[in-house]
Amino acid sequence: QLDITPLCSEETMVACSPDSPYGDVVSPRDLDPASEIVVSWRKSVQDWRDHWFGLTTAPLLYADSMQVVNTFLGSEMMWAIVPAAAARALEKEGRAKICRLTDPPPERVSYLITRRGEALSDAAQLLLEDIRTEMRHIPGIQLFI
């Protein structure tokens, strides 16, 4: 048996080149899907993408890690849908400008999964506290525990 507890939720944002002409808030209608780097495989983001761009619209690139976004985001029109923590890390490194969406995909929820009836180890407690400390300072993240 497991206990599944929501840990946090994260807004989903657009990461684009620092030289991008996009403003602080962008409509999905203003995004060119041919310039998109798809890095999220969450069904809710895929459904959002299908809604705005159609089922047959191909992105520029499918990526399996944020490192790919970091590498390819140099062109002013390239963009990617990323969760808040990744967005802020890219922004802090000067690698991306972050834009909010007028109609974003659903927020990403992360969970703490533990064995029912077992207390967290001291190491796990420390890790959880470190996560809380780091995440409470990131705009776009809501902590639940």
Give the predicted meaning of each segment.
Residues S110-I113:
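A short beta-strand structural signal in non-transmembrane regions
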Residues L2-M77, A86-E107, Q125, E129, ...:
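C-terminal regulatory
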Residues D122:
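Short, conserved charged micro-motifs
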Residues E118:
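Catalytic strand-loop-helix junctions within cyclic-nucleotide turnover domains
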